[in-house]
Amino acid sequence: MAVIQDIIAALWQHDFAALADPHIVSVVYFVMFATLFLENGLLPASFLPGDSLLILAGALIAQGVMDFLPTIAILTAAASLGCWLSYIQGRWLGNTKTVKGWLAQLPAKYHQRATCMFDRHGLLALLAGRFLAFVRTLLPTMAGISGLPNRRFQFFNWLSGLLWVSVVTSFGYALSMIPFVKRHEDQVMTFLMILPIALLTAGLLGTLFVVIKKKYCNA
């Protein structure tokens, strides 16, 4: 718990030297890994802020806190392993009450979008779906339910994971290198730190609202 407090304090104070400490940066990697794994792997956790976290990772790379290639490798593994977990849920637990309940709690627009993409493009939908919140968690579950072979799924899973992590993280890095952004570095880093928290809160409240609304309507 003390390490988490140190990380938050270092981010808030923009103390990148402290964040670059091997012990602290390993915890940062762990938190990012866990967040991406859960967001990609569990439907109830699909509200977690994966995109904004990758942008923050790119900004931290630009500040010398983390290295580019290890970050891409670690976060790609997190996203792809999480996506595999989502596929397994659909393949082996798709007909269970629990998974059906999770699917029912997702906003209808995301379910319709994922269904349309999967029906039209099959596994190729994973490449574009990775860049859409909620959809990237839902598509692997649908692939598992449809009975698609694991070998075919894994190819598109890891390819789309690498593409998503590389593009969004590189965007965060490039954004941090823009002269205007560099001149307002403190404000930008504060924004990038607050953004995932704000999105997490909004996603959690939105999910709770949908759950309560559906329970009220079914009562």
Curated annotation (Swiss-Prot):
<dbReference type="InterPro" id="IPR032816">
    <property type="entry name" value="VTT_dom"/>
</dbReference>
<dbReference type="GO" id="GO:0009410">
    <property type="term" value="P:response to xenobiotic stimulus"/>
</dbReference>
<dbReference type="GO" id="GO:0022857">
    <property type="term" value="F:transmembrane transporter activity"/>
</dbReference>
<feature type="topological domain" description="Periplasmic">
    <location>
        <begin position="39"/>
        <end position="67"/>
    </location>
</feature>
<feature type="transmembrane region" description="Helical">
    <location>
        <begin position="192"/>
        <end position="212"/>
    </location>
</feature>
<dbReference type="InterPro" id="IPR032818">
    <property type="entry name" value="DedA-like"/>
</dbReference>
<feature type="transmembrane region" description="Helical">
    <location>
        <begin position="161"/>
        <end position="181"/>
    </location>
</feature>
<dbReference type="GO" id="GO:0005886">
    <property type="term" value="C:plasma membrane"/>
</dbReference>
<feature type="topological domain" description="Cytoplasmic">
    <location>
        <begin position="89"/>
        <end position="160"/>
    </location>
</feature>
<dbReference type="Pfam" id="PF09335">
    <property type="entry name" value="VTT_dom"/>
</dbReference>
<dbReference type="GO" id="GO:0055085">
    <property type="term" value="P:transmembrane transport"/>
</dbReference>
<feature type="transmembrane region" description="Helical">
    <location>
        <begin position="18"/>
        <end position="38"/>
    </location>
</feature>
<comment type="function">
    <text>May be a membrane transporter required for proton motive force (PMF)-dependent drug efflux. Required, with YqjA, for the proper export of certain periplasmic amidases and, possibly, other Tat substrates. May play a role in determining membrane lipid composition.</text>
</comment>
<keyword id="KW-0472">Membrane</keyword>
<comment type="similarity">
    <text>Belongs to the DedA family.</text>
</comment>
<protein>
    <recommendedName>
        <fullName>Inner membrane protein YghB</fullName>
    </recommendedName>
</protein>
<keyword id="KW-1133">Transmembrane helix</keyword>
<feature type="topological domain" description="Cytoplasmic">
    <location>
        <begin position="1"/>
        <end position="17"/>
    </location>
</feature>
<keyword id="KW-0812">Transmembrane</keyword>
<keyword id="KW-1003">Cell membrane</keyword>
<keyword id="KW-0997">Cell inner membrane</keyword>
<feature type="topological domain" description="Cytoplasmic">
    <location>
        <begin position="213"/>
        <end position="219"/>
    </location>
</feature>
<dbReference type="GO" id="GO:0043093">
    <property type="term" value="P:FtsZ-dependent cytokinesis"/>
</dbReference>
<feature type="transmembrane region" description="Helical">
    <location>
        <begin position="68"/>
        <end position="88"/>
    </location>
</feature>
<feature type="topological domain" description="Periplasmic">
    <location>
        <begin position="182"/>
        <end position="191"/>
    </location>
</feature>
